[in-house]
Swiss-Prot record:
Single GO biological process annotation from the record: fatty acid biosynthetic process
UniProt xrefs under PANTHER family: 3-HYDROXYACYL-[ACYL-CARRIER-PROTEIN] DEHYDRATASE
Gene3D superfamilies tied to this protein: Hotdog Thioesterase (3.10.129.10)
Gene Ontology cellular component list: cytoplasm; membrane
Reactions this protein catalyses: a (3R)-hydroxyacyl-[ACP] = a (2E)-enoyl-[ACP] + H2O
Organism expressing this protein natively: Baumannia cicadellinicola subsp. Homalodisca coagulata
SUPFAM superfamilies reported for this sequence: Thioesterase/thiol ester dehydrase-isomerase (SSF54637)
Locations listed in the record: Cytoplasm
Protein's UniProt keywords contain Cytoplasm: yes
UniProt keyword annotations, A-Z: Cytoplasm, Lipid A biosynthesis, Lipid biosynthesis, Lipid metabolism, Lyase
Name of this protein: 3-hydroxyacyl-[acyl-carrier-protein] dehydratase FabZ
Active site: H54
Length: 149
């Protein structure tokens, strides 16, 4: 279903990530280059279950879930860069530093998730993540994921 070798659709994302509804937060990968970068999309719908309580009358996409979406994007880039893992291995979200939230994300927005590979050592990879909406930075952070059984 891929239109080119740098695009991943839902079926391919589901093969890489263990996350499922309602916690899969990457809709499509629009471009990537192994060991360098990945761009992905998360379309924000009012139908997301957390909008019932966050916040009634003023729905805001939770910041921690923006971070989780970027972490899932780093996992996809790590899997695509390192190749298929042993069936007992996963990439775990290991750390986050310097997280900043710059603008709210609301229903109807489309988040562009950008993650850039910084370095990898002994199964721990470091990335910089930036999420934008309409060209404006909504969130940025440094993240690490660890390859473990």
């Amino acid at each position: 279903m891929t239109t080119n070798s740098h695009t991943l659709h839902l079926e391919e994302i589901l093969e890489l990530l263990p996350h499922r509804f309602p916690f899969l937060l990457v809709d499509r990968v629009i471009d990537f280059k192994k060991w360098q970068f990945l761009y992905a999309i998360k379309n924000v719908s009012y139908n997301e279950p957390f909008f019932q309580g966050h916040f009634p009358g003023k729905p805001i996409f939770p910041g921690v879930l923006i971070l989780e979406a970027m972490a899932q994007a780093t996992g996809i880039l790590a899997f695509k860069s390192a190749g298929k893992l042993d069936s007992s291995e996963l990439y775990y979200f290991a750390a986050i530093d310097n997280a900043r939230f710059k603008r709210p994300v609301q229903p109807g927005d489309q988040m562009i998730l950008e993650v850039k590979f910084i370095k990898e050592r002994r199964g721990v990879a470091r990335f910089k993540g930036v999420t934008t909406v309409d060209g404006e930075v909504a969130c940025e952070a440094l993240m690490m994921c660890a390859r473990r059984q």
